[in-house]
Amino acid sequence: MNALLIYPEFPDTFWSFKHALKFIRKKASFPPLGLLTVATMLPDEWSKRLVDVNVANLTDKDLEWADCVFFSSMVVQRKSAHQLIKRCKEAGVKIVAGGPLFTSEHEQFKDVDHFVLNEAEITLPSFLEDLKNGCAKPVYRSPDFADVRETPAPLWKLA
């Protein structure tokens, strides 16, 4: 399975610090920590790639390579998330989404195939098991909180 992890673009606002980043030789303010942690939790035999749209463009080759895409977004990334999800849907790629934006507004994203909401450390394993067995549901959620002492380290080699 080829899993493409996509982090949508932050809009250019005062709080994005976009214009100040060049002074400290950085391309983005906020690394995709959630997606890098999810990447660690995906099966080892899967091939994984990360596209952080804040530092690189999503290409047609990326979408051709992918069997599925995983999105994580904050609410401020809503516009970019909608645009990228539409593009993935048009490419015929299976879409999985989680993170703050989708946890609070998943009803607004009709093109997403599967939502892994709330704490991925809790909900992602159930989704992956169902996916392996061919019975993945549209929505996975739990009211429980993850114990951060048990959260795996992010897969930094993708960054």
Where do the language-model regions lie?
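Acidic, low-complexity intrinsically disordered segments
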Residues: M1-A159
